[in-house]
């Protein structure tokens, strides 16, 4: 599987309420470098990111993920991407909908592509 397919699988897993923590790399012993910034949080370190994603999966449902402009560059062991994503979900009886911008970095480790950085922000005009 290449980096683009991994990103598409992540989007599909989000849509279907499947676990997302497995898409993120484990920290290497020498660093605490895995980072995920979402619409309302910043998680640092693989353990924090993975727990945050498990909590998100447990507390949300009915995700809509509309990828509008996915761009991926892949090299031997690193890839980076950006996308414009229509994002919506249910949480606590309330529907949340945003136009978002995504960017991230994946690393090829042990035969798989894993996120080492993911940033999701709300797209607004100033």
Each language-model region and where it sits:
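Hydrophobic/aromatic beta-strand elements that line small-molecule binding cavities or substrate pockets
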Residues: 53, 67-72, 85-87, 100-108, ...
């Amino acid at each position: 599987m290449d980096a683009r397919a991994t990103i598409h699988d992540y989007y599909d897993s989000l849509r279907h309420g499947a676990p997302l923590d497995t898409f993120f790399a484990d920290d290497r012993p020498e660093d605490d470098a895995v980072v995920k910034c979402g619409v309302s949080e910043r998680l640092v370190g693989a353990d924090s990111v993975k727990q945050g994603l498990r909590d998100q999966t447990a507390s949300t449902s009915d995700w809509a993920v509309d990828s509008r402009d996915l761009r991926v560059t892949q090299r031997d062991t690193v890839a980076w991407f950006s996308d414009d994503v229509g994002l919506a979900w249910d949480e606590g009886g309330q529907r949340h909908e945003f136009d978002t911008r995504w960017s991230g970095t994946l690393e090829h480790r042990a035969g798989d592509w894993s996120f080492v950085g993911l940033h999701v922000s709300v797209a607004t005009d100033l």
